[in-house]
Amino acid sequence: MTERYADKQIKLFSLTSNLPIAEKIAKAAGIPLGKMSSRQFSDGEIMINIEETVRGDDIYIIQSTSFPVNDNLWELLIMIDACQRASANTVNIVLPYFGYSRQDRVAKPREPITAKLVANMLTKAGIDRVVTLDLHAVQVQGFFDIPVDNLFTVPLFAERYSKLGLSGSDVVVVSPKNSGIKRARSLAEYLDSPIAIIDYAQDDSEREQGYIIGDVSGKKAILIDDILNTGKTFAEAAKILERSGATDTYAVASHGLFAGGAAEVLETAPIKEIIVTDSVKTKNRVPENVTYLSASDLIAEAIIRIHERRPLSPLFSYQPKGKNNA
């Protein structure tokens, strides 16, 4: 969408974590970003001021709770409170990246379930709906007692790889860990390609001892994961694929954090191209072979469909050309 959206009762606001994607979402939706200010005092306290009326409006607040996670989360909570006190009709949050979603279960004795805690805090603050992108664990949706729309990036990736000609039996989609099989299978189905899995000890020091379940010899491999953090998982997986006879290795992830020297790790790995979405704005150095694929159109369309009470199901698939549309 390029024209101004007709219904002025809907308003978008961007907080400070990822202004670039917010601007793209606003442009795609045809809704200008609302006027507000956010500043941090010398002691770390956050002050927000909404500089226009929101009374009776449906508000969508765009904020990735990425690094610095706690500052961005608190900024979001304070903005929610400000909208509630200003008599907004509904307050909806758009989280391109949902921090703390990896802490979704008790993996060891006496561990918290922080994703549930964050869900409780956001709900208590007064939100009506969550729109997010590729949750690390889909069960996090169940931590909320309000609607949660978890948009998928796999259709975006499938369209990209199809246009590059990376599909069919000479391509294999690889999950770098056994917990990502469902994601790999989803992309593989779009590309009409087989899948493979790398299984290895979870200890970082033993990653290079991983082994492949499936056939990658003589094939172009696409590694897929949801979060690219330090880059070690992709880097070691790419080395294993190279040793196992893969001709080229590509990598794709929904969220590119690039933390802890990830650029240095990935630049020495045999990976031809890394694709991530723009869900996270990072200050860390990014490898030169990274391509950003914007999720802004997808999120903008979801916002408009929600506001117009239309189904989101058309956003959850990609129909490659030449396939039967029946």
UniProtKB/Swiss-Prot annotation:
Binding, ATP: 43-45, 102-103
Gene3D superfamilies: 3.40.50.2020
Main location: cytoplasm
Positions contributing to D-ribose 5-phosphate binding: 225, 229-233
CDD domains given in the database record: PRTases_typeI (cd06223)
Keywords: ATP-binding, Cytoplasm, Kinase, Magnesium, Metal-binding, Nucleotide biosynthesis, Nucleotide-binding, Transferase
Top-level division of the source organism's lineage: Bacteria
Pathway annotation from the record: Metabolic intermediate biosynthesis; 5-phospho-alpha-D-ribose 1-diphosphate biosynthesis; 5-phospho-alpha-D-ribose 1-diphosphate from D-ribose 5-phosphate (route I): step 1/1
Record EC number: 2.7.6.1
Co-factor remark: Binds 1 Mg(2+) ion per subunit.
Subunit structure: Homohexamer.
Protein name from the UniProt record: Putative ribose-phosphate pyrophosphokinase 2
Species this chain originates from: Streptococcus pyogenes serotype M3 (strain ATCC BAA-595 / MGAS315)
Lineage: Bacteria, Bacillati, Bacillota, Bacilli, Lactobacillales
